Each structure stands twice: as C-alpha cells, then as structure tokens.
C-alpha cells in the first residue's frame, strides 16, 4: 500500500513565490519517496488554528502517515506548543519530517530548540 503524505507549506512574509517554491520542494520529496499526497496546506503568516485542527483530525482518522514540511519553523508557535503538536501526531501514527531538520520526535525537539537559541549581548551575537 502506498504511503500517504500531507504537505504543510507556509510563508512567513506572505510571498506567493516562496509558497510555490516550498510546495514544489515538498512535492518532489514526496514523489521521490513514492508517497501519495492527500492534502496540501498552504498558509501565510502564522499557522492557523483550523489547519492544526484539520491535521489532528486527519491523524486521528489515520488519513495519512507522513507530515512533510520545509523546517521546524513552519509550525510558527512556541516550542512547548510545537512539541505538543508533534507528540499528538506521532501518537496517532504520523511521522513528522522536515527537509531541513530531518525527522521530528519528542526526543529530538529539545536539542533542536537549543540549537536555535541565540544570546544577544550588546551588539555582539553568540550562538
């Protein structure tokens, strides 16, 4: 049976070109892995609550096996809320994959959060 995927595309600044580029990248990745794309969410700005509810409902009803997005920032929410979304999807049989960050799991997310944390002191930036 062919695996099913949902693509989650988001442009923070509302750029249609960025959305199309992301959609093409994700579609190519799904095709290369022989996944059937069952739904594409395309959003600008902050990820909407309705999209998150749709994802949860689809996961609960086992309508897809993979959620694919460009990177972790696609969720556009605080780390604890993002972790809860990933946890819920995994518990319902969905593997969360990103092109830039790999597979997301509840175990890998804390490291991902720490790697993105930056400290600013005066005009100098520390990673």
Each model region followed by its residue ranges:
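Short, structured surface patches at the beginning of a domain
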Residues: 1-127
């Amino acid at each position: 049976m062919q695996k099913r995927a949902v693509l989650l595309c988001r442009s923070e600044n509302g750029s249609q070109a960025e959305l199309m580029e992301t959609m093409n990248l994700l579609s190519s990745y799904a095709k290369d892995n022989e996944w059937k794309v069952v739904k594409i969410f395309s959003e600008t700005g902050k990820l909407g609550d309705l999209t998150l509810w749709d994802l949860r409902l689809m996961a609960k009803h086992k309508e897809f096996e993979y959620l694919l997005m460009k990177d972790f920032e696609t969720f556009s929410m605080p780390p604890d809320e993002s972790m809860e979304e990933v946890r819920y999807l995994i518990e319902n049989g969905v593997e969360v994959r990103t092109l830039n960050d790999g597979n997301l799991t509840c175990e890998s997310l804390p490291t991902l959060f720490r790697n993105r944390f930056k400290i600013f002191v005066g005009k100098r930036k520390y990673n």
